[in-house]
Structure formats: C-alpha cells, structure tokens
Amino acid sequence: MNTETTNQQTPTQESKPSTRPPLPPFTRETAIQKVRLAEDGWNSRDPEKVALAYTIDSRWRNRAEFPHGRQEIIQFLKRKWAKELDYRLIKELWAYTENRIAVRFAYEWHDDSRNWFRSYGNENWEFNGNGLMALRFASINDLPILESDRKYHWPLGRRPDDHPGLGDLGL
C-alpha cells in the first residue's frame, strides 16, 4: 500500500481560497455593508466563523496583543468571549478608501463577577482583493458602568435592524 496516497490531507479552511463580498474598491454603501457584516459576525461570538473574514496570515493589533493568522485569531477570540460575557457590539463607519475602512465601536459586556463595562474603540482595517481583512488595528478603552446604565438590551446575537446606532444612543 502506498502510504503517500492514503495519508493525503484534505483541504482545510486554511488552503481554500475564499471571497468575502462586498469587495474593494469600496463605495460608501459597500463600506457600510462591510461594517455591518463585521458587527454581525462578532455578535455571533463564533470564533471559527469570525476568523473566516480574515486572510490566512492576517495581522492584528488588539490592545496589547498581536495575533497573526487565523488560528491565533480563533484562540484570541475564544479567550476574549470567555472573559467578556453577554457581549453585544455596535460598529459604525468612520471613513473609507479604496481598500481600507475605519470604524468606531462600542460594546457592552460583564465579567464573571457581574461587573458591567462599555468598551469604546476604533479600528483600522485593510482588505485584500477578495474582500478578506489582511490587517486590523484596534484601540480599545473599558469604562465600568452600572447594569442600569446599559444601552444594549437586544437578545444575544445580531443587533436588530431597528435598534439605534452609536450616534442615536449618544455614544
């Protein structure tokens, strides 16, 4: 028996080329769509699903962490959502160019002691021609809040279409 033939690996998500519309060059409308798709993905809190929006060798700076590649991104997100419970996020387009998008965002979460936080931040994204994010730079600050000060009350998952955005909420 030829072991080379029987031990061949099947293609994985790492080796399959993928496209993630909308694709660059972005218009205002497609940049807004891209931001909402990213928000929806992150609100799923599914690290494997979220990681598919990034290139195989995507580079991040998230606070003081520097994940590189999908596998490190998945591990980072698993740690994040194990700590940031009942996570709900709103993103808003700030600026865009041909293949770059800047967003501002705020998300609410609590720790395992039920201490609530609202985290504010900005992200800069750069996309390849297939619409996958190759670079992500995020700056984030956490503000402790009272549970009664929460503004995000939708059921876990995707933010409803009729829910106010950041500007509407005064954030």
What are the residue ranges of the model-derived segments?
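A beta-strand edge to alpha-helix "cap/lid" segment located at domain peripheries
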Residues: 2-26, 75-171
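Short, well-ordered alpha-helical segments enriched in acidic and aromatic residues
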Residues: 44-57, 61
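Short, aromatic-enriched amphipathic alpha-helices that serve as compact interaction elements
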Residues: 27-44
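Short solvent-exposed beta->alpha transition segments
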Residues: 59-81
